[in-house]
């Protein structure tokens, strides 16, 4: 079985082909970061229009990369949510039209389930059950995963997601979009403990997150450090970035440890854009070693949005006979807990 995957939920156009026998055989990606940089963030209308321009050429490029024709595709998977409604509709419409024209089944895939499945594309994939930390610009969730579709939300952000807090704080530091990535690079040059940020919601029971207060704390710290010209010196910027990142990482470590101890699980899967953060990876690895457990995450190119994770997730579900009807429907808000469970599917 060969599945074409299409991802258009936000500002990346991703197309990939997953082959049951050979694994991932094509992966094409176009990022809109440069286009949105002038605006300091994603402009939904521009994102949608660019997906219209790029999706079909990327499908053609993926088929060429895999040395396949359309007649050799057995199904199409597409991101149907959560995400920007206009961007989602582009991918969904193209996927549904191609599935009808090629006479193959189509499947609407949950974007965050795609991220959750991304580590399955690696050489040493995790086995169920495990705790999943989904951490991106739009989501920060701790999920108990018993199998495909068997999800229990243990905790999530009650305000800003971690990635959103990174981006907003980076912007306060005068960094260009995407500011979160630039903040992490700045933090590497920071002096530890010059500034100490709070670790929100770690002084009480529970697994929920709150990151909006860290952004406010950063703003107040920045304002207190401005010189007479209203500027921050470079080392102070690095030190504030370091303190902010350390607070986020510490908070996540504490919550992950609680989730593992609460469930008795020994495997942790981390996925989503922020899962590429070097410090977070290093400290989670140290924590899991102390707990005699193991942490799994996708390679950096599959941390951000991509078509490979959608193609793979679509393959798993289409193989079990799941499919979507002919209607073009997207879900900008879509709880993962409503997804169909694939019974007794404990190894993929």
Curated annotation (Swiss-Prot):
Its EC number is 2.3.1.234. Fe cation binds at residues 111, 115, 305. This is tRNA N6-adenosine threonylcarbamoyltransferase. GO terms for biological process: tRNA threonylcarbamoyladenosine modification. It catalyses: L-threonylcarbamoyladenylate + adenosine(37) in tRNA = N(6)-L-threonylcarbamoyladenosine(37) in tRNA + AMP + H(+). Its cofactor is Fe(2+). Binds 1 Fe(2+) ion per subunit. Substrate binds at residues 134-138, 167, 180, 277. It comes from Haemophilus ducreyi (strain 35000HP / ATCC 700724). CDD domains: ASKHA_NBD_TsaD_bac (cd24133). The lineage of its organism: Bacteria, Pseudomonadati, Pseudomonadota, Gammaproteobacteria, Pasteurellales. HAMAP family: TsaD. Belongs to the KAE1 / TsaD family. InterPro entries: ATPase_NBD, Gcp-like_dom, KAE1/TsaD, Peptidase_M22_CS, TsaD. GO terms for cellular component: cytoplasm. NCBIfam families: gcp_kae1, T6A_TsaD_YgjD. Keywords: Acyltransferase, Cytoplasm, Iron, Metal-binding, Transferase, tRNA processing.
């Amino acid at each position: 079985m060969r599945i074409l995957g299409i991802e258009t939920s936000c500002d990346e156009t991703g197309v990939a082909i997953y082959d049951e026998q050979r694994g991932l055989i094509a992966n094409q990606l176009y990022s809109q970061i440069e286009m949105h940089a002038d605006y300091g963030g994603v402009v939904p209308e521009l994102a949608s229009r660019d997906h219209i321009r790029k999706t079909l050429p990327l499908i053609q490029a993926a088929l060429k990369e895999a040395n396949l024709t359309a007649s050799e595709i057995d199904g199409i998977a597409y991101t149907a949510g959560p995400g920007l409604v206009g961007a989602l509709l582009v991918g969904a419409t193209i996927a549904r039209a191609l599935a009808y024209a090629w006479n193959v089944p189509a499947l609407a895939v949950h974007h965050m389930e795609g991220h959750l499945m991304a580590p399955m594309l690696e050489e040493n994939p995790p086995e169920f059950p495990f705790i999943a930390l989904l951490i991106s610009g739009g989501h920060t969730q701790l999920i108990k995963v018993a199998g495909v579709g068997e999800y229990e939300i243990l905790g999530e952000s009650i305000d800003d997601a971690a990635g959103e807090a990174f981006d907003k704080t980076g912007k306060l530091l005068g960094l260009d979009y995407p500011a979160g990535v630039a903040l992490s690079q700045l933090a590497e040059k920071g002096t530890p403990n010059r500034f100490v940020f709070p670790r929100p919601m770690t002084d009480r029971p529970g697994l929920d997150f709150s990151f909006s207060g860290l952004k406010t704390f950063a703003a107040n710290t920045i304002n207190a450090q401005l010189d007479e010209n209203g500027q921050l010196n470079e080392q102070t910027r690095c030190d504030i970035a370091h303190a902010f990142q350390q607070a986020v990482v510490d908070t996540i470590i504490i919550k992950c440890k609680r989730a593992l101890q609460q469930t008795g699980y020994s495997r942790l899967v981390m996925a989503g854009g922020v899962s590429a953060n070097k410090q977070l990876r290093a400290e989670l690895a140290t924590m899991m070693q102390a707990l005699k457990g193991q942490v799994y995450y996708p390679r950096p190119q599959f941390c951000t949005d991509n078509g490979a994770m959608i193609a793979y997730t679509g393959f798993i579900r289409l193989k079990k006979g799941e499919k979507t009807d002919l209607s073009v429907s997207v879900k900008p808000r879509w709880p993962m807990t409503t997804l169909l469970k694939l019974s007794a599917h404990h190894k993929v």
